Each structure stands twice: as C-alpha cells, then as structure tokens.
Amino acid sequence: AQQDLEAWKLSCHEQISQLEQSVQQFSSVLDHNDVMSLDMAQDYDKLHLSNPWFNEYYREEQSKLFIKALKVRKQFLYENRKNVMAAAKIWDSQNKYIERKNIIEAAWGWINLTIPVISSTFASFSRMCKNLGVNTIGHLFIDEAGQAVPQASVGAIFRSHNVMVVGDPSQIKPVLTMDSNILNMLREHFGVTEKYLSNSASTQTLTDCASRYGFYKEEDRSDRSWIGIPLWVHRRCLDPMFTISNRISYNGFMVQGNPGNGKTGWFDVKGKANDKYVKEQGEFLLKKIKKMIEENPAIIDKKAKDIIYVISPFTNVAYMLSQKLKGIGFTRFDDHGKPTNVGTIHTFQGKEAPIVFMVLGADQQSAGAARWAVSEPNMMNVAATRAKKEFYIVGDKKLYLNCGGDVITETYEVISKYKKQYPELIDDDVNSVMEYNNDITRIEGVIADVKRGKRAKYAEVTGYDNKTYTIDENIFSQTINAENIISKGNHISFVIKSQG
C-alpha cells in the first residue's frame, strides 16, 4: 500500500511539473502577441468591455476554420444527396411513417444537417416537430424568452439535448389571455408558487431559477433577485436613453458600450382623452413629424429603413396616431395592412430606430390607466431603449408625475438633469411646433389610372384621405423614370400646395 501511495504521489508530481511547463510556455507565447488575458483588477466598466483571450488574428483563423467546415459539409451532402432527397420526401409524408417514428427522426437529422439553423415560432414548432422524440434536436436557442409563457416552450425543450435561453425579464412581460385572478385560483388549487404561474412568469425567469450560474441583482441575495448570466454591456442607445434604462431597470449595473450624447425632451401637451387618446397630442405629433419630414424627406421613403417610431402604452392611442399620420405619408404598413412604425410598446420589442416618440395619452379622467402605464419599469425601459439617438415623451407632465412611483419620477429626473448638462440637446418646445405652419401638404395614395393627354401622360391618384388628385402633364414629363414610377396601382407619396 505504501508503494502504491508513493507511486501515486510521484505520478501527481510529474503531472504538476508538466502543467507548470505548459503554463510557462503559454505565458511565453502571450508575451509575444496582443492577446489580452482576463484582468480582474480592472475597474467595473473596463472589465465588462474587455474581450480576453481574443484578437483579430484569432477572429481570422476562426472564420477560415468555419469556411473550411462549410466546404466539408457541402461535399458530404453532395455525396449523400440521395439520402437528403429521401429525407425531404419522408418529412413531407410523415403520416405514412407515424408508426415508425425513428424513420421520421432520421429524416430530421438529414434535414437539420442540410439546414443547420432552422427558425420557428413556438406555435409553428408544435406542428413542425410533433413527431420528434426526446433529445432529437441538438441545440435549441430561445430568443426573447422574457415574453414567452413557460408552457409555450415545454415541447421544444423536451425535444432538445442542449438549450440556451436569451431574454430580459425587465422588458416586455408575457402576454396573457387569462385574468390574473384566475391564475391565482389555479395556483392555489394545484399548490404551485408564483414562480411557475403568475403574470410575470416566463421561460426566461424559470431558466434563470434553474441556472447554476447567475447573479444576485439585489443586496438581500433573495431567490427573487437571482438572474441568469447577465450581459451588462449595452451597445444600442446613446445617453440619456441608456441612463434612463439603467436607472429604472438594472440598478446601475449596465455598462455603456456606445458612448455619446443623444437628444431628448418631454413635450408637455394636455387635453381631454377619448379612450386614452388625446387629440391635442395627435395634432402636436402630426405637426412635429411634418416639420421633420421637410428637413429630412427620407423619413417617409418607404425603401429606406425606419427613422422614426411612434409608440404608446395604449392600443387606441396607437391606432388613432397611425390613422392620423397616414395622411402625411408617415405610417407604413405590412402586407396585412398592419402599421409597422406606429404601435403599442409591446409590438416594438427587439426593434430599434434612430428616433422614438412615446405618446402617453390619458387625462385626469383616465388617471388609473396612466398609473398602470408607469407602474412598472418594463414599458418605459422598452420604449427608451428602442431609440438609438433621440427619445421624446409626449404627454401631460403634471398628470403623470402625480401618478407617483419610481419609474416616471426617475425618468423625469434623468431628463431634467440632462437638460441642465446639455441644454442644446433638449427639444421640448411645444409652442414653436404648434405655431409652425406652411402651405405644403404631403399626401400618400395609389395611382388609380394613367391617361394620355395632349402633350404627355397624366395620372389620377386616390389619396388615403379618400380625395382624388391629378398628376398633370407637366409633372409627368418632368419626372425621371415616370413610366415606372407613375404606373397604375403604384403607391406614391407627393406634396401639394394649398391655394390659400
């Protein structure tokens, strides 16, 4: 036994010696290149902004390896193209193999090898993968998991060998179709805690609870303050949007990865609300955006990316604004006729634009709705962090500040402090906008017909305001590429001069 012990100790010493030599060799290599090691002595911000054990050379070699791996896979798939084609046929005819699901799973393996990354919603996943068994999917990545109710992800997680969940419970919560009182009754009946069944429970919150690695965001180190691995560096917004978000939602832990100063302001517009929509706020926003369009016509260029988002906590406010702004060619629609740049805060999760207007709506008669809108930081956090460069609030300042609570108070404090520091970056002058007037009106519509005139063609346009306009022969002949642009059925945007 003594000999065995001595032999084991000698073996351990040899292993330690080998490891020490490896460390020395590695240290020698590090001394002669620009690879930065992890330095825990750095201050908080620098530590999070650092990128240890990585450099440009590593990135290039990583990319080369990836390209070579793709070539190997391409050749393998070419050599086995008959199997790939057979797998596609099996996948399209799953009902024939319902009693032999191992064949369906084998077909999935070939399909997933051919298409390594397959994107789906949970609703589509339940139909697409209903015949797959446990651990048949190698890696599952769930994005925006803070919005997903836990039960929606069960089937996908059950079928996956590895799961990575990405989300932020501090942003939009899951949308529930069931009243919170019913949730309380179900929770009591089945004896489960709020962690599993409540209006704040999500795939992200449950994954955070199950994660062995994470972070206590509160000093009390309670279970409720435990979150998964936080990515604290924020690279989207300039200040003060970053500061608003960091203060109301993240206890100051976020690190600014996009330094610089943006513009902000609170336009104090009051009025009587009809289902939370305040006509005066709509009129103000119409004139404000109209003025901005004249300064930058790209705002309504449908081929360009969105420059401005208009968002609101309330559905009716968003709808009324989308209709009002449609008249100046601002509102954009998808193929189903749904506005894409005007909507509720919930519809803009994950999106971004240089400029965001948050229209609060409500009046004293709907003060309860106003309190709800700012009762928790989630919606203000999402609204502020949609804006990359400029963030403006439109609403009754007195009404909302009287709602109380940390969210609106701290948001206002950040904007007020920013105003003192950078007065040139503040835009909150309501009067100059309301007094602004010109004789230019921009209309959006559809070309109803193109006809031949005496000297050139002319066109009749049906505006979205249901009025009929004419593009006369002079304008038609002066328009570059007119035959393609001014064609029947095309959507166009144009300006008209009022006649006094």
Task: Give residue ranges: language-model regions.
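Short, charged beta-turn/beta-strand-edge "cap" motif at the junction between a beta-strand
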Residues: 361-362, 495-500
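Structural motif
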Residues: 118-119, 141, 164-166, 311, ...
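ASCE P-loop NTPase helicase motor core
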Residues: 90-91, 96-248
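The feature marks helicase ATPase cores and/or their adjacent C-terminal helical subdomains
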Residues: 1-30, 180-182, 189, 236-248, ...
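Helicase C-terminal subdomain and adjacent C-terminal extension
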Residues: 179-229, 365-456, 464-470, 478-483, ...
